[in-house]
Design a protein with these regions (language model features):
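Short, Lys/Arg-enriched, Gly/Pro-containing loop segments at transmembrane-helix junctions
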Residues: 255-264
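Membrane-water interface segments at the C-terminal ends of transmembrane alpha-helices
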Residues: 2-35, 48-155, 184-204, 211, ...
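The alpha-helix within a helix-turn-helix
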Residues: 166
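Glycine/proline-centered hinge or cleavage motifs at structural transition points of membrane proteins
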Residues: 169-170, 183
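Short alpha-helical elements of helix-turn-helix
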Residues: 145-148, 160, 179, 204, ...
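Short hydrophobic, aromatic-rich alpha-helical segments embedded in or entering the lipid bilayer
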Residues: 35-48, 210-223
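Short glycine/proline-centered loop/turn elements that form peptide/ligand docking sites
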Residues: 158-162, 262, 271
């Protein structure tokens, strides 16, 4: 190996050790619940815990609801900003980036104050209302990631030409959006969806202060009262996050601007008009 390559290789190796060693140590500790042998006893205990199944199921359902609401909000917004309201683009980008600046604790206290039992819209009076409020909060937290992913996908296709072609064939606006534009940004929407899923699964502040049985507060509770199970849960959460990142990369590598079957864009416009 050339001397000029040794330095970068050493830096990469040390950086890899910095990230990999804590994971290896955590995984090794999670296998040490039974003295003297390595076993998956901690994982068995975690998966056998009814509270784990309840909280994880709750967070998965909340994540799916967040993805649906986020996509319904972001896809039309990104479409209209690129098609008709280019001057509003800086404002829309500023609004979508606010969740990165404003702490979640500020958001949740605002929700509690605005939608408490004495409010004109008392969401916190019922479990279903509080769950809905939690999903709204998750949508806000996921806006920077969902909007950026969808907007990047729309930048890769000619929205104006597609819209004009579909309109010339008699397609309505809703048809254009859902049958022409959406199939071409499907990979971008899925990328934002996987990021949203990873965020919601581990979110703690909103779920804890709204007193919802989510996976994030469960992780904190187990971490405060157990020894080996938190390590197992950390590895499970890590695996879920990296699975989402892998799926994101898989869909992101797909060529934009083509339908699922590989047909050109103008054929989508013709099909939408039928």
């Amino acid at each position: 190996m050339n001397a000029s390559r040794i330095g970068p290789a050493v830096i990469v190796f040390l950086g890899a050790l910095y990230f990999v060693l804590p994971l290896v140590a955590t995984f090794e500790f999670s296998l040490s619940m039974l003295r003297g042998i390595w076993s998956f006893e901690a994982y068995r205990v975690v998966f056998a815990d009814p509270q784990f199944r309840t909280t994880f199921s709750f967070s998965v359902i909340a994540a799916l609801a967040t993805i649906v609401l986020g996509a319904l909000l972001v896809v039309p917004t990104a479409y209209w900003v690129r098609l008709r309201f280019a001057k509003l683009r800086p404002l829309v980008e500023f609004i979508t980036l606010l969740p990165l600046v404003i702490p979640p604790i500020v958001l949740v206290f605002g929700y509690i104050r605005l939608y408490n039992s004495s409010s004109w819209l008392p969401f916190t009076n019922s479990a279903s209302g509080t769950n809905l409020l939690l999903v709204f909060g998750y949508v806000v937290l996921s806006l920077p990631y969902m909007f950026r992913a969808v907007d990047t996908g729309m930048a890769a296709i000619d929205i104006r030409t597609l819209t004009e072609a579909a309109e010339s064939l008699g397609a309505k606006r809703a048809t254009i959006l859902f049958r022409v534009i959406l199939p071409n940004v499907r990979a971008a929407v899925l990328s934002g969806a996987f990021l949203t899923f990873a965020i919601v699964i581990g979110e703690f502040v909103l779920a804890s202060l709204l007193n919802r049985p989510a996976f994030g507060p469960y992780l904190a509770l187990i971490g405060a009262n157990r020894a080996y199970e938190p390590a197992a849960l950390a590895m499970i959460a890590f695996a879920i996050t990296w699975a989402c990142m892998g799926l994101l990369q898989l869909f992101a590598n797909r060529a934009p601007g083509r339908a699922r079957s590989g047909r050109p864009l103008f054929k989508l416009a013709r099909r939408a008009a039928r």
